[in-house]
Amino acid sequence: MNNSMILLMVIASFVAGYLSTMNLWANSIGDIRLHLNDFYMVLLMVGWMIVMCYILMKSHMGITKTQLIITITIIIIIVYAIRTQAFIDDKQYLNGMIPHHSMAITMSKWIVNRTKDPRIKQLATDIIISQQNEINEMNSILDERKLQNKVF
């Protein structure tokens, strides 16, 4: 496999990964946002994919040791960026938390109808209300400061 095919695989994997992030779970299409934490996580997944391809399919992939070292270095940098929330400002924070809260609403809406445990049903109902209130508050701040990062 030549370098252009490896690059194509990496790009395709990145796009597929980015489309499969928390936004997929959003309760509302208006809660879908682009933000750095998803970008970091997808880069991390793609990095690990390259490492696994090197380990498992070294003879087929054509990935050099130099490329592997560069990839591992990038993985370390990305892990550092995730753990320290590098470059995450107010806008990135709020636009990252909205799909996270929206996902909690989606999960809670489903469990409310499936559980027989009244405590879980009440907890899920409380989560739906509180998370929606927090999404509304975050949207108000983003609107007020003109920081919206909506996709749709």
UniProtKB/Swiss-Prot annotation:
Keywords: Glycoprotein, Membrane, Transmembrane, Transmembrane helix. Disulfide bonds: none annotated. Pfam families: DUF305. The chain crosses the membrane at residues 5-25, 36-56, 68-88. Its main location: membrane. It comes from the Viruses. It is found in: Membrane. It is a multi-pass membrane protein. This is Uncharacterized protein L153. PANTHER family: SLL0788 PROTEIN. One of its GO terms (cellular component) is membrane. The keyword Acyltransferase does not apply. Glycans are attached at N2, N113.
